[in-house]
C-alpha cells in the first residue's frame, strides 16, 4: 500500500505565506494606529467644544436670540471658530443665529472664490464686504513699514458698520489663549501696562459687543483641528506687509515655555482671572492713600515679611462658576 502523500511547502509558497503574514500584521498595526488617531482626534474635538462652551458660559457671550457675526478671514482660527459654533448651536439649549462675514480688502492675489464656495457648501449664511483698504494703506504707509496698525483700524471700523447693517448683536473674533498671553506680554514688555485681550468687551464706538469664544483654546490644538478638518486656508501674507516682529517674538517665547516648562503659560493665562488689586500698585484700582490699620484680621492682608506661597497653580478662568451652553455626554 502506498504511503499517504504529504504536500511539501516549496520556497515560493513559504515566501508567499511570510508576505501574507507580514501584511496581516501590518494591517492590524495600521488599524491600531488608525484607532489611536481617531481616539485622539475625538479627544481634540471634545476638548475644543468644551473649552468654547465654557468660555461662552463663563462670560455670557451668547444669549437667546442673538445674531452672531463670525468674522472669517480664511485663517485656521476663524474657520475653527465658525465650525465649533455651528456644532455647539446644534446642542445648545438656546436659539441663536450665525452669519459669516469676510472683508475682501483687495490684496493682489487674494483668492476671492474660496470663502464663498466653502460657506455655500456648508450652508452658512454669509456676507462678503468688498472694500479696497489695501490701496489706502499702501498709499499712506511708507514702503518697508508694517501696515498692520492702520489696516486693523480700517478693518475694525468697516466690520462694526457691517454688523449694524446685518443686525448682528455680537461680533465673534477668532483670538485664542496664545493671542491673549502674547498681548499681555507685549503690553508688559513694550507698553508698561498690565493689559491683556478680554474675552468680551464693548467696542470703542459703544455700539457693539465683541466676543472671543476661542479664549480658552490653545493654538496648537487649533492647528491640529484645522488640519483634521481640511479647511481651505488662505495665506495671511498676501498684503506683503512686514511681519509684526514683536508679536512673533512673544509667540516663539510662549512656544518655548510650553515645551520646556509645562504649565507655565497656563498659569500665566489663569492669572488674568485671579487678580489681587491690593497687591499691585495701581491707585485707581485700590485706595492705597486712604488705607488705615483697622485692628481686625484681613484674609487678604499682606503677610509683609514672608514670601508669598506659590507653585500651587492658579484656578482657571471662571472657576466653579462656569456654565456651559451644551451638554457633552452625547458628543
Curated annotation (Swiss-Prot):
It is found in: Cytoplasm. A motif (PP-loop motif) lies at residues 73-78. Its cofactor is Mg(2+); [4Fe-4S] cluster. Its main location: cytoplasm. The keyword Calcium does not apply. InterPro entries: Rossmann-like_a/b/a_fold (IPR014729), TilS/TtcA_N (IPR011063), tRNA_Cyd_32_2_STrfase (IPR012089), tRNA_thiolation_TtcA_Ctu1 (IPR035107). Its EC number is 2.8.1.-. The keyword ATP-binding applies. It comes from the Bacteria. Gene3D superfamilies: HUPs (3.40.50.620). Keywords: 4Fe-4S, ATP-binding, Cytoplasm, Iron, Iron-sulfur, Magnesium, Metal-binding, Nucleotide-binding, RNA-binding, Transferase, tRNA processing, tRNA-binding. Binds 1 [4Fe-4S] cluster per subunit. The cluster is chelated by three Cys residues, the fourth Fe has a free coordination site that may bind a sulfur atom transferred from the persulfide of IscS. Pfam families: ATP_bind_3. GO terms for cellular component: cytoplasm. Pathway: tRNA modification. Belongs to the TtcA family. Homodimer. HAMAP family: TtcA (MF_01850). Catalyzes the ATP-dependent 2-thiolation of cytidine in position 32 of tRNA, to form 2-thiocytidine (s(2)C32). The sulfur atoms are provided by the cysteine/cysteine desulfurase (IscS) system. The thiolation reaction likely consists of two steps: a first activation step by ATP to form an adenylated intermediate of the target base of tRNA, and a second nucleophilic substitution step of the sulfur (S) atom supplied by the hydrosulfide attached to the Fe-S cluster. This is tRNA-cytidine(32) 2-sulfurtransferase.
